Protein backbone atom coordinates (compact mmCIF):
# COMPACT_ATOMS: atom_id res chain seq x y z
CA UNK A 1 0.00 0.00 0.00
CA UNK A 2 2.79 2.47 0.79
CA UNK A 3 4.33 1.94 -2.65
CA UNK A 4 1.07 1.98 -4.64
CA UNK A 5 -0.78 4.88 -3.00
CA UNK A 6 1.78 6.58 -0.78
CA UNK A 7 -0.49 6.10 2.23
CA UNK A 8 -0.67 3.99 5.38
CA UNK A 9 -3.89 3.10 7.17
CA UNK A 10 -3.76 4.71 10.61
CA UNK A 11 -6.98 3.06 11.75
CA UNK A 12 -10.35 2.24 10.21
CA UNK A 13 -11.11 5.91 9.59
CA UNK A 14 -7.94 7.51 8.36
CA UNK A 15 -4.91 7.40 6.14
CA UNK A 16 -1.43 8.66 6.81
CA UNK A 17 0.12 10.23 3.73
CA UNK A 18 3.79 9.28 3.56
CA UNK A 19 4.77 12.60 1.95
CA UNK A 20 3.21 14.43 4.92
CA UNK A 21 5.36 12.40 7.31
CA UNK A 22 8.48 13.07 5.22
CA UNK A 23 7.74 16.80 4.94
CA UNK A 24 7.19 17.01 8.70
CA UNK A 25 10.52 15.34 9.35
CA UNK A 26 12.19 17.49 6.69
CA UNK A 27 10.69 20.61 8.25
CA UNK A 28 12.66 20.00 11.46
CA UNK A 29 15.91 19.75 9.47
CA UNK A 30 14.99 22.87 7.51
CA UNK A 31 14.22 24.74 10.74
CA UNK A 32 17.63 23.77 12.17
CA UNK A 33 19.27 25.02 8.97
CA UNK A 34 17.40 28.32 9.21
CA UNK A 35 18.54 28.76 12.82
CA UNK A 36 22.13 28.12 11.73
CA UNK A 37 21.82 30.71 8.95
CA UNK A 38 19.85 33.49 10.67
CA UNK A 39 22.30 36.19 9.60
CA UNK A 40 22.54 35.08 5.96
CA UNK A 41 20.82 37.37 3.45
CA UNK A 42 17.93 35.86 1.53
CA UNK A 43 18.72 34.88 -2.06
CA UNK A 44 17.03 32.71 -4.67
CA UNK A 45 19.65 30.04 -3.98
CA UNK A 46 18.83 30.11 -0.26
CA UNK A 47 15.12 29.67 -1.06
CA UNK A 48 15.93 26.81 -3.46
CA UNK A 49 17.84 25.06 -0.68
CA UNK A 50 14.87 25.38 1.69
CA UNK A 51 12.51 24.03 -0.98
CA UNK A 52 14.82 21.10 -1.71
CA UNK A 53 15.21 20.31 2.00
CA UNK A 54 11.46 20.33 2.60
CA UNK A 55 10.57 18.15 -0.39
CA UNK A 56 13.47 15.66 -0.02
CA UNK A 57 12.30 12.07 -0.44
CA UNK A 58 8.73 12.98 -1.44
CA UNK A 59 6.93 12.04 -4.64
CA UNK A 60 7.31 15.66 -5.75
CA UNK A 61 11.08 15.27 -5.82
CA UNK A 62 10.67 12.72 -8.62
CA UNK A 63 8.07 14.73 -10.56
CA UNK A 64 9.73 17.12 -13.02
CA UNK A 65 6.55 19.26 -13.14
CA UNK A 66 7.05 20.13 -9.47
CA UNK A 67 10.59 21.42 -10.15
CA UNK A 68 11.81 20.82 -6.60
CA UNK A 69 14.66 23.20 -5.82
CA UNK A 70 13.57 25.60 -8.56
CA UNK A 71 10.80 28.05 -9.30
CA UNK A 72 7.33 26.94 -10.37
CA UNK A 73 6.74 26.04 -14.01
CA UNK A 74 2.96 26.32 -13.98
CA UNK A 75 0.58 28.99 -12.62
CA UNK A 76 -0.73 28.48 -9.10
CA UNK A 77 -2.94 30.30 -6.63
CA UNK A 78 -3.45 30.79 -2.92
CA UNK A 79 -6.53 28.93 -1.69
CA UNK A 80 -9.33 27.39 -3.68
CA UNK A 81 -12.39 29.43 -2.71
CA UNK A 82 -11.88 33.14 -3.41
CA UNK A 83 -8.40 32.22 -4.63
CA UNK A 84 -5.67 34.84 -4.76
CA UNK A 85 -3.87 34.88 -8.10
CA UNK A 86 -0.09 34.74 -8.01
CA UNK A 87 2.82 35.82 -10.19
CA UNK A 88 3.08 33.98 -13.51
CA UNK A 89 5.98 31.49 -13.73
CA UNK A 90 7.93 33.48 -16.35
CA UNK A 91 7.88 36.55 -14.08
CA UNK A 92 8.91 34.78 -10.85
CA UNK A 93 12.74 35.00 -11.13
CA UNK A 94 12.65 38.77 -11.64
CA UNK A 95 9.92 39.30 -9.01
CA UNK A 96 11.83 37.31 -6.37
CA UNK A 97 15.15 38.96 -7.21
CA UNK A 98 13.58 42.40 -6.93
CA UNK A 99 11.82 41.55 -3.66
CA UNK A 100 14.95 40.11 -2.06
CA UNK A 101 17.27 42.90 -3.24
CA UNK A 102 14.96 45.55 -1.78
CA UNK A 103 14.51 43.57 1.42
CA UNK A 104 18.21 42.90 1.97
CA UNK A 105 19.17 46.54 1.27
CA UNK A 106 17.75 47.99 4.50
CA UNK A 107 17.28 46.94 8.11
CA UNK A 108 13.68 46.44 9.24
CA UNK A 109 12.12 46.91 12.66
CA UNK A 110 8.45 47.61 11.95
CA UNK A 111 6.00 44.68 11.87
CA UNK A 112 4.28 46.32 8.90
CA UNK A 113 7.51 45.97 6.89
CA UNK A 114 7.60 42.25 7.69
CA UNK A 115 3.92 41.87 6.79
CA UNK A 116 4.48 43.60 3.43
CA UNK A 117 7.47 41.41 2.69
CA UNK A 118 5.58 38.25 3.65
CA UNK A 119 2.51 39.26 1.64
CA UNK A 120 4.65 39.96 -1.42
CA UNK A 121 6.47 36.62 -1.11
CA UNK A 122 3.18 34.76 -0.79
CA UNK A 123 1.59 36.53 -3.76
CA UNK A 124 4.62 35.72 -5.91
CA UNK A 125 4.16 32.11 -4.72
CA UNK A 126 7.47 31.11 -6.33
CA UNK A 127 7.30 27.34 -5.89
CA UNK A 128 4.94 24.66 -7.14
CA UNK A 129 4.11 23.70 -3.55
CA UNK A 130 4.85 24.53 0.13
CA UNK A 131 5.06 28.31 -0.42
CA UNK A 132 3.20 29.02 2.81
CA UNK A 133 5.52 26.93 4.94
CA UNK A 134 8.63 28.41 3.38
CA UNK A 135 7.20 31.93 3.54
CA UNK A 136 6.34 31.63 7.22
CA UNK A 137 9.74 30.13 7.99
CA UNK A 138 11.64 32.96 6.29
CA UNK A 139 9.40 35.41 8.16
CA UNK A 140 10.51 33.68 11.39
CA UNK A 141 14.16 33.87 10.25
CA UNK A 142 14.04 37.53 9.28
CA UNK A 143 12.37 38.54 12.56
CA UNK A 144 15.17 36.75 14.42
CA UNK A 145 17.77 38.41 12.20
CA UNK A 146 16.31 41.81 13.16
CA UNK A 147 16.46 40.86 16.88
CA UNK A 148 12.66 40.89 17.05
CA UNK A 149 10.42 38.25 18.57
CA UNK A 150 9.61 35.64 15.92
CA UNK A 151 6.18 34.11 15.52
CA UNK A 152 4.43 30.95 14.43
CA UNK A 153 0.93 31.00 12.95
CA UNK A 154 -1.13 28.64 15.09
CA UNK A 155 -3.72 26.45 13.44
CA UNK A 156 -6.47 28.24 15.38
CA UNK A 157 -5.43 31.56 13.80
CA UNK A 158 -4.91 30.28 10.27
CA UNK A 159 -8.30 31.65 9.07
CA UNK A 160 -7.31 35.13 10.32
CA UNK A 161 -3.90 34.81 8.68
CA UNK A 162 -5.47 33.82 5.34
CA UNK A 163 -7.98 36.67 5.62
CA UNK A 164 -5.04 39.02 6.21
CA UNK A 165 -3.37 37.84 3.01
CA UNK A 166 -6.60 38.12 0.98
CA UNK A 167 -7.45 41.60 2.22
CA UNK A 168 -3.91 43.00 2.45
CA UNK A 169 -4.15 45.29 -0.60
CA UNK A 170 -7.25 47.00 0.83
CA UNK A 171 -6.45 46.83 4.54
CA UNK A 172 -3.05 45.71 5.79
CA UNK A 173 -4.19 45.78 9.43
CA UNK A 174 -5.74 42.29 9.27
CA UNK A 175 -2.38 40.67 8.55
CA UNK A 176 -0.37 43.01 10.77
CA UNK A 177 -2.75 42.43 13.69
CA UNK A 178 -2.66 38.65 13.22
CA UNK A 179 1.14 38.63 13.08
CA UNK A 180 1.25 40.90 16.13
CA UNK A 181 -1.10 38.63 18.09
CA UNK A 182 1.05 35.61 17.22
CA UNK A 183 4.17 37.53 18.21
CA UNK A 184 2.55 38.34 21.58
CA UNK A 185 1.66 34.69 22.09
CA UNK A 186 5.21 33.59 21.26
CA UNK A 187 6.55 36.21 23.68
CA UNK A 188 4.41 34.71 26.46
CA UNK A 189 5.73 31.23 25.67
CA UNK A 190 9.32 32.42 25.77
CA UNK A 191 8.76 34.26 29.05
CA UNK A 192 7.18 31.15 30.60
CA UNK A 193 10.07 29.02 29.38
CA UNK A 194 12.61 31.45 30.86
CA UNK A 195 10.85 31.27 34.26
CA UNK A 196 11.44 27.52 34.49
Question: Where are the language model's segments positioned?
Answer:
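FIC/Doc superfamily catalytic core
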Residues: 1-129, 133-196
